[in-house]
Each structure stands twice: as structure tokens, then as C-alpha cells.
Amino acid sequence: KLWYFVTFIQSPPGFGKTSLLRIFYPTVLKKIVSHNTETRDVFEALNKLDVKDKNRIKRCAVYLLTRSDYALIDDEEMYSRAEQTSLFLALLNVRFVIATIKTLMRLTGVGSEDLYKIAYTPQDANILDAELDFPRTRCSCKDLLDWASEKEKEIYKAINSFEREGNSVFSCSSLFVLPLMNVQWFSYPGHTLCEEFIFQLDDAHKLTKEQRSTLEKVCIETRLNVTFWIAERLDNLVSSELLETDKQERDYQVIELDKYKDKKSIEFEKMVKLIANRRSTYAMADIDLMMLLANSDEGEWEQKYRAGAQKYLHKLSTNPEIRSYENLIKAIESIMDIKERAYNARALLMF
């Protein structure tokens, strides 16, 4: 039940949940080919999962990282619980539209100045139920981006305002954009897109308790009929907050990466193990920081971190695709702490 189903992916810190999600990025999937010995095993796993074949990408990620700013919405002095829920869902919706456009740009190679060339043609009557004045007729990705950007600004204005301006709270009760971001409704001349999007919400543990409860409730009650993966740290959950087992399998499933032994999904389990063991291979780096430091004596740690930092900074400085991050690279180079320099360089490289 990986496809067209809601899946909660839970793991302890550092077990590789984010690396697992990122393997489905369009840019990463393009690098995984059958004739490359370095990626052949991952390609075969993806092929068996019907994610990619030798000719094209079939499924790819629309990735959204949970930010800490969602917590700003939980202001009981400013908004009622219903209004907080509306703002939370509205913000998630507009950000998933932006994330979808980013995925389409990576699939097509289109830059932001040519987004008008990617057409969006909704074909389902459910478009009439869209909220937040979502575009209901044929338009371009440029139009969608303008809509989402403007709505995000309005939501931020409402969140950051110290005074209520009339009743201008956004009315939103569902994750309505997920089924509307149907890849079949997008087209780009001379380019074949994928068959399905995998919507991903990473670091969901950063949501407040009420927001996480709202997310779970919306996923169950709406029956989204999309592939939606929600990744969160297991250590942030207590037994009373874990998902209700009587609703699992029917409405959603839970995968604990450190315990996943479902024989019915053996191919996905293999995929999990591959990514956990090789989580750095597809991040443009040819050194795994954990392997670099593994089994080293305590007295050697500074030399190991220094070597790692130098390697990653060299990769960053020689990669033409990330020249726009020169200021960040300079800032990392100026970090005095060797360990912090290595980790920050690697983080930017993976990004």
C-alpha cells in the first residue's frame, strides 16, 4: 500500500528517514541508472517498486520540510482553535503548491522565468470544491506560483499581526491541493512528465500537538486518494500520541524504519536498508562522514573532521550548480569549530 495511500514514516533520530525521502527527488532519480555499478542496486529496487525504469521516472517526490514557524499559529490570545486550524491548513496547502512547482521545474529543467510554459489544466469536478480562491480553470505554473506566493504573504501578515483586521482569517478545512496537484493535469511541450507525485511532509514532529492531531484527522476523514508520506521522529512521540491501531491499514499505515519487517513489502524493506547504508552516495559527495569517523581513535577526531570539511568545501567550490551559495560557503569556511565546519559543509552539499 505504498501508492495512493497515507503512510506515516517514523524513525529514531539519524536512522535515515530524510535520506529515504530524498531518494525520490527528480534530480536524484535522474542520476540513478542501471548501467552504473554505483547505483545499480538502488535502480533495481526502484524498478521493482515501479518508481523508475530504464526509460523514464514514473513516480517522484513533492517534498515539503516542516518549519518551526507553524508553531507561531498556535496563539490562543489572537485566534480561536478553529481559526488556528484554518491558518495551519491554509499554509500547508499553499506550500505544497510551491513544492509541486519546484518538482515540475526539476522534471522539465524549466527555470523560473519560463514557468508560463508549463500548463495546468484541471479536469475533475472536485476542482469546484477548492478553497482559498484556488484557480479553477486552465492556467500556467506561473499563475499557480503567483497565487501561492500571494496567499503565503497574506497568511504571514495575519500570523504576524498584533491586531485582528476584521474577520480576515483564511477559511480552510482540508488538504485540498494534494488531489488537485495531479501530475496528469500538468503538461510541458515536448516533455513527458511522471505518472504520479509522492507528496512528502518531512520532520512532522516539529508541528505542535494540536497541529499533528489535525493533520492525522484530515488525512483520515478526507480520504485523499494520493500518495502522502509523513515522516517524523519516533522519540518525540509517547504511547498515547501514537496512531490508533484500529484505523491502520484501513485509512493509513505506519512504518517504523528501525523495526520494519513486513514480508509483504520486502522490496520496500530492501530499499530502506539500501538508503540507510548508503545515504550519502547521491548527495554529490564521495565520502560518507559517518564512515570517515567510524572506528577512529578519540585523538584522531580533529584530523578526520578537518579532512571531511576540506573535501566537502572543495566539492562545493567546484560545483557550478551551487555558485549562488557563495556567501554561505564563505560563512562555512569562516567557522572556527572544525566539527561544525564539517557538518555545515556537508549539510549544504546534501541540500
Predicted feature residues:
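Conserved Walker B catalytic segment
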Residues: 164-231
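Short regulatory helix/loop adjacent to the ATP-binding pocket of P-loop NTPases
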Residues: 237-252
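P-loop NTPase nucleotide-binding core
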Residues: 22-183, 248-351
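Conserved lysine of the Walker
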Residues: 17
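Short glycine-/polar-rich loops that comprise or flank the Walker A/P-loop
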Residues: 4-5, 57-60, 195, 223-227, ...
